[in-house]
Amino acid sequence: MTEAQLTLPTTKLSPTQKTQFIKLEKKLRRNVGQAIAQYNMIEDGDKVMVCLSGGKDSYAMLSILMLLKESAPIHFDIIAVNLDQKQPGFPEHILPEYLDKLGIEYHIVEEDTYGIVKEKVPEGKTTCSLCSRLRRAVLYKAAKKIGATKIALGHHRDDMIETLMLNMFYGGKMKAMPAKLVSDNGEHVVIRPLAFCKESELIQYSELKHFPIIPCNLCGSQPNMQRQNIKRMLNDWHDQFPGRIESMFTAMQNVVPSHLCDSNLFDFKSINSTSGIINGGDTAFDEVAIEAPQDLSMKNQPNADQLLNVVEVK
């Protein structure tokens, strides 16, 4: 399959939509390529298991990774994996038909986690937490079976910011979603290639590509209200204060432990009058110089010249 076949949507676009699509896809490719390079997500010879749920994010992740594979200076394999959790009404034909058209290797893993969740969680309660744990266990098992070296999940920038706010407001921790981590069982490396991608752009991309979306509410579970509240708050901030969300994500990549309060991250006890000024000293009450948040780009990245081969859109 050629890059042009991978790129163009299956339905006809107007000239304006086509221009919009090309610009958007180029930006998503650049952002995914930058995340891969910055966190060393994919290496030569990797077998990447792309977890495909049937939602907009995982479809977009698969699409962009397939494009990058065509132009990357390294070789890596992609295997799409979907977990059929036996939810009532799940359209089992959609993903196989879509993946057959792409001509990509894939596996449909059938595991009745839905039945377990319904048995364990009282009616009307949110099932997402238990469902997520069961799903991870099945996917880790699948990754081991197919020999995957990386597991790719479709969480994006907005998911990461929401998780940070959730943990701050409800968990008392400054903790978000890492772009790269070791799996719960200690056997796999999990990556989030969409870490630098905005949800709004993924929605737009999905609409232009006309992905065959499978709804995520087939289980009948109520949404996580805390996360929904955080999402609404962030959306309001985005509307009222343009650039605030971008600034928040930049802050997540620019942490100054000496100016927080965690003694595990910084040795406050050893500070004395001979320690010198640390990271600017006490500027808590000085007026902060506000700079317009910059969109993710290569110009402020260290070793930018080394990343271009991975990120370059050909």
Curated annotation (Swiss-Prot):
Recorded E.C. number(s)?
2.8.1.-
Highest classification ranks of the organism: Bacteria, Pseudomonadati, Pseudomonadota, Gammaproteobacteria, Alteromonadales
Gene it is expressed from: ttcA
- Primary localisation category: cytoplasm
Q: What class of enzyme is it?
A: transferase
Q: Tell me, in a sentence or two, what this protein's role is.
A: Catalyzes the ATP-dependent 2-thiolation of cytidine in position 32 of tRNA, to form 2-thiocytidine (s(2)C32). The sulfur atoms are provided by the cysteine/cysteine desulfurase (IscS) system.
Q: Which reaction does it catalyse?
A: cytidine(32) in tRNA + S-sulfanyl-L-cysteinyl-[cysteine desulfurase] + AH2 + ATP = 2-thiocytidine(32) in tRNA + L-cysteinyl-[cysteine desulfurase] + A + AMP + diphosphate + H(+)
Kindly list the cofactors needed: Mg(2+); [4Fe-4S] cluster
The protein's GO terms of the molecular function aspect are: 4 iron, 4 sulfur cluster binding; ATP binding; magnesium ion binding; sulfurtransferase activity; tRNA binding
UniProt keywords (A-Z) are: 4Fe-4S, ATP-binding, Cytoplasm, Iron, Iron-sulfur, Magnesium, Metal-binding, Nucleotide-binding, RNA-binding, Transferase, tRNA processing, tRNA-binding
Query: Does the record bear Magnesium in its keywords?
Result: yes
Q: How is the cofactor bound?
A: Binds 1 [4Fe-4S] cluster per subunit. The cluster is chelated by three Cys residues, the fourth Fe has a free coordination site that may bind a sulfur atom transferred from the persulfide of IscS.
UniProt protein name: tRNA-cytidine(32) 2-sulfurtransferase
- What does the miscellaneous comment read? The thiolation reaction likely consists of two steps: a first activation step by ATP to form an adenylated intermediate of the target base of tRNA, and a second nucleophilic substitution step of the sulfur (S) atom supplied by the hydrosulfide attached to the Fe-S cluster.
